[in-house]
Amino acid sequence: MRTLWIVAVWLTGVEGDLSQFGDMINKKTGTFGLFSYIYYGCYCGWGGKGKPQDATDRCCFVHDCCYGSVNGCDPKLSTYSYSFQNGDIVCGDDDPCLRAVCECDRVAAICSGENMNTYDKKYMLYSLFDCKEESEKC
């Protein structure tokens, strides 16, 4: 019950595209994205360091790198326009920064869906303290 309460409190603080990103992951993986990926491996969730643990974690590593290349807005707080058309995620913003954030999320959601077979529950709630190897460069 305590875990459910913590997740509920955390979700009330989710704004902008992080909730949108969660929605994209939900559609592409069939999972509750924010819960399934929030502390997965070394890169899914807040921060990231070390070596990605599997292909799923690598999707998050690439997503972090993509966010790092966005200029002109805060990727974690920006709200963008997108839709689902015939199972595809379509980014719809004219603003270059918002479109870039949406594209980062779109690519990561597709990657997560394509790598569901590598998702390993042993990496759920993974501690960054276990991510000791040298971090890769983007």
Swiss-Prot record:
Active site per the UniProt annotation: H63, D105
Keywords associated with the record: Calcium, Disulfide bond, Hemostasis impairing toxin, Hydrolase, Lipid degradation, Lipid metabolism, Metal-binding, Platelet aggregation inhibiting toxin, Secreted, Signal, Toxin
Coiled-coil region list: none
Disulphide bridges: C42-C131, C44-C60, C59-C111, C65-C138, C66-C104, C73-C97, C91-C102
SUPFAM superfamilies, alphabetized: Phospholipase A2, PLA2
Record protein name field: Acidic phospholipase A2 2
GO biological process: arachidonate secretion; lipid catabolic process; negative regulation of T cell proliferation; phospholipid metabolic process
PANTHER family linked to this entry: PHOSPHOLIPASE A2 FAMILY MEMBER (PTHR11716), PHOSPHOLIPASE A2, MEMBRANE ASSOCIATED (PTHR11716:SF9)
Cofactor note (record): Binds 1 Ca(2+) ion.
Co-factor(s): Ca(2+)
Reaction catalyzed: a 1,2-diacyl-sn-glycero-3-phosphocholine + H2O = a 1-acyl-sn-glycero-3-phosphocholine + a fatty acid + H(+)
Family in the record: Belongs to the phospholipase A2 family. Group II subfamily. D49 sub-subfamily.
Domain of life: Eukaryota
Tissue-level expression: Expressed by the venom gland.
Function: Snake venom phospholipase that inhibits ADP- and collagen-induced human platelet aggregation. This inhibition is completely inhibited by abolition of catalytic activity in case of collagen as inducer and partially inhibited in case of ADP as inducer. PLA2 catalyzes the calcium-dependent hydrolysis of the 2-acyl groups in 3-sn-phosphoglycerides.
Subunit relationships: Monomer.
Protein's cellular compartments: Secreted
Enzyme class per UniProt: hydrolase
Keyword Cell inner membrane in annotation: no
Record EC number: 3.1.1.4
Native organism: Macrovipera lebetinus (Levantine viper)
